[in-house]
Curated annotation (Swiss-Prot):
Main location: secreted
Signal peptide interval: 1-30
Compartment(s) of residence: Secreted
Additional comment: Is the major venom component.
Protein name: OMEGA-myrmeciitoxin(02)-Mg1a
Similarity-based family: Belongs to the EGF domain peptide family.
Job of this protein: Ant peptide with probable defensive activity which acts as a potent agonist of the mammalian epidermal growth factor receptor (EGFR) (EC(50)=6.3 nM). Mimics, both structurally and functionally, vertebrate epidermal growth factor (EGF) peptide hormones. In vivo, intraplantar injection in mice causes long-lasting (several days) hypersensitivity of the injected paw to both mechanical and thermal stimuli. Its long-lasting effect is unusual for venom toxins whose effects are usually immediate.
Naturally occurring in which organism (per UniProt): Myrmecia gulosa
Disulfide bonds: 39-52, 47-63, 65-74
Domain of life per record: Eukaryota
Organism ancestry: Eukaryota, Metazoa, Ecdysozoa, Arthropoda, Hexapoda
Molecular-function annotations in GO: epidermal growth factor receptor binding; growth factor activity; toxin activity
Tissue expression notes: Expressed by the venom gland.
Keywords: Disulfide bond, EGF-like domain, Neurotoxin, Secreted, Signal, Toxin
Domain called EGF-like: residue spans: 35-75
Length: 80
């Protein structure tokens, strides 16, 4: 009985890890306009490796990073 329980747990764990892997490789396809308006010209270089948009509700700029980059201003490269 104990071995059966362990086998069942392993199967569920493997399925969960596979699901996480599939979800993590899916690329975001949302339009930047879904997040806010494009940044003004004075903020055009705010995002180092990404697109800048302005969040009206927070009254601040934000970035949508290009694939392979992350950080609040897309300043870090993902080496994985």
């Amino acid at each position: 009985m104990k071995n059966n329980y362990i086998s069942t747990c392993i199967v569920y764990l493997m399925a969960a890890l596979l699901l996480i892997s599939v979800i993590s490789i899916k690329e975001c396809t949302a339009d930047i306009s879904d997040y806010g308006d494009p940044c003004s010209d004075d903020l055009k270089d705010y995002c180092i490796h990404g697109d800048c948009f302005f969040l009206k509700e927070l009254n601040q700029p934000a970035c949508r990073c290009y694939t392979g980059y992350y950080g609040s201003r897309c300043e870090h490269i993902d080496h994985n």
